A protein has these predicted regions:
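...captures the hydrophobic TM-helix bundle architecture rather than a specific catalytic motif
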Residues: 1-213
Length: 213
C-alpha cells in the first residue's frame, strides 16, 4: 500500500508538470510504478487465496466492506461531474452565452454512437451477470462464455468511444461543455478499460480453475 500510494503521488505530480510544461516523463514514470505495484499486489492476493488459504471468512468480509466503500467513493466521484453538468446546463450563465449547449458547440447525435455504446454497456451487464450466475450454479462453460462475451463488448465499447473522440468537433478547452464532456466520459471510459482488463484476468484465472461457487 505504501509503494502504491507513493506511485500515485509521483503520477499526480508528473501529470501536473505535464499540463504546465509538457514534461511527461514524471507522469509516465508514476504510471509505470503504479501498474507494477498493482500487479504485484494483485498477484499476492491470488497467491494468498489459491495457494496459502489465507482468505478466511473474516478476510472475505473485509474484502466485501472494502469493495462497498470503493463503490461508494466511485458514486460520489461521478456525482461531482453530473453536478457540474446539470449546474451549468440547467442554469447557463454569461460565460456560455446564456444558452446550453454553447452556440458554437456542435454536439453528438444522441441516437448515433452514444445510443450504440449505451446498448453495448447494457448488453455487457447482461453477459457478466450470466457469467456470475453460471459460476454460482457450477456451470463453468457458461461462466467462461459469459466472460468472453463481456470482454469483447468492453473492448468494442472502448473502440467506439475512441472513434467518437476522434471525430469530435470540439476540444477539451472549448468552453465548460468540452471540459465536462471529456472529463465525465473520459473517466467513464477509463473505468471500462480497467474493468475489461480485470475481467480478462478473471477469464484467464477461470480457465485455470481458480474460481468456485
Amino acid at each position: 500500500p505504501i509503494y502504491v500510494s507513493f506511485s500515485c503521488l509521483v503520477l499526480a505530480i508528473g501529470a501536473v508538470y505535464y499540463m504546465h510544461s509538457d514534461v511527461s516523463w514524471g507522469m509516465y514514470l508514476g504510471l509505470a510504478l503504479l501498474i507494477y505495484g498493482a500487479y504485484m499486489w494483485f498477484r499476492d492476493v491470488v497467491i494468498e487465496a489459491e495457494h496459502q488459504g489465507h482468505h478466511t471468512p473474516v478476510v472475505q468480509i473485509h474484502h466485501r466492506y472494502g469493495m462497498t466503500l470503493f463503490i461508494a467513493s466511485e458514486v460520489m466521484f461521478f456525482v461531482a461531474w453530473f453536478w457540474a453538468y446539470f449546474d451549468v446546463s440547467l442554469f447557463p450563465n454569461d460565460f456560455v452565452g446564456n444558452v446550453w449547449p454553447p452556440k458554437d458547440i456542435v454536439t453528438f447525435d444522441p441516437w448515433d454512437i452514444p445510443l450504440i455504446n449505451t446498448l453495448v454497456l447494457l448488453l455487457s451487464g447482461t453477459t457478466v451477470t450470466w457469467s456470475h450466475h453460471s459460476l454460482l450454479e457450477g456451470d463453468r462453460k457458461g461462466f467462461i462464455q459469459g466472460l468472453v462475451l463481456t470482454v469483447i463488448l468492453g473492448a468494442f465499447f472502448t473502440a467506439l468511444q475512441a472513434y467518437e473522440y476522434h471525430h469530435a468537433t470540439f476540444a477539451f478547452s472549448d468552453h465548460i461543455y468540452g471540459s465536462v464532456f471529456y472529463m465525465a466520459t473520459g473517466f467513464h471510459g477509463f473505468h471500462v478499460i480497467v474493468g475489461t482488463i480485470f475481467l480478462a484476468v478473471c477469464l484467464w484465472r477461470g480457465k485455470l480453475g481458480h474460481f468456485t461457487k
